[in-house]
Regions:
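An amphipathic, hydrophobic-aromatic interaction surface with interspersed Lys/Arg
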Residues: 1-246
Length: 246
């Protein structure tokens, strides 16, 4: 968090997604969904969000009579946009900033409590959403991640939230080492780019591969196993194969 002063008033500004409150994140997602729907211009939405962060409830802060304060806020606005600009889905740093939605519990940070079966379903929906989405992919993603009943329809905020969290976790796992129990583990060896045009992660067919090993039991047993347990098992298998080739 960063402390600034607007006149005599101290304001605490978040410096990353880890610092934002539930209300700040919800407001951001509402504005972002409005931008995507074409209801508001992106720059206007970003200014509105920044005004919310600094608690500005008056005239436009960009036209303040106090030039020094106005210049300071403009500079801060540009600095802040580096990490929450609305030209892209937010990188939530693998943190679930919306743990509850209408009483429905979402996944833990880093999808810590998600089963392998649910993770694979989410990967399919994520892939669909990145290619050509008519809304079915983001709805499916939200239903799996928040275990929504058939009568509950996810809103735009929840759909964006699920896409953002899923993208953040997959990007972190597939791009390089991450810390697991104090040890750096490079899960990128599990993800094989170019495995097929319909398989951007390279994880298609992996469930059958793991089931054949019998480590987690049958096909159903693998799907019911924690996602991280299966990922670490796959990591060990990939590393063993690499050693055999040397």
């Amino acid at each position: 968090m960063k402390e600034i002063r607007i006149g005599k008033r101290p304001v605490m500004l978040p410096e990353s997604w880890e610092d934002v409150t539930h209300d700040q994140y919800w407001t951001y997602m509402l504005l972002f969904s409005a931008v995507l729907a074409g209801a508001i211009h992106r720059l206007e939405a970003e200014k509105t969000f920044f005004s919310f962060l600094i608690g500005w409830n008056g005239a436009d802060w960009t036209r303040m009579a106090d030039r020094d304060t106005a210049d300071m806020l403009r500079a801060l606005f540009l600095e802040q946009r580096e990490w929450w600009g609305m030209d892209r889905l937010p990188d939530t740093e693998c943190i679930n900033l919306l743990p509850l939605w209408r009483g429905h519990k979402g996944p833990d940070d880093w999808l810590g409590d998600m089963t392998w079966g649910s993770f694979c379903e989410c990967l399919d929906f994520l892939s669909m959403g990145m290619q050509d989405d008519d809304g079915a992919a983001t709805e499916g993603l939200a239903r799996v991640m928040y275990r929504l009943p058939a009568e509950e329809t996810p809103d735009g905020v929840l759909r964006l939230q699920c896409m953002a969290l899923m993208q953040s976790v997959v990007a972190a796992m597939s791009s390089g080492p991450i810390s697991i129990n104090g040890r750096d583990v490079d899960l990128s060896v599990v993800f094989h780019a170019g495995h097929g045009s319909g398989d951007p992660t390279g994880l298609a067919g992996v469930t059958f591969e793991v089931a054949e090993s019998g480590v987690f039991g049958s096909f159903r047993g693998v799907n019911d196993t924690g996602m991280w347990d299966v990922m670490l098992y796959l990591y060990k298998c990939r590393k063993s194969k690499e050693k055999e080739k040397k």
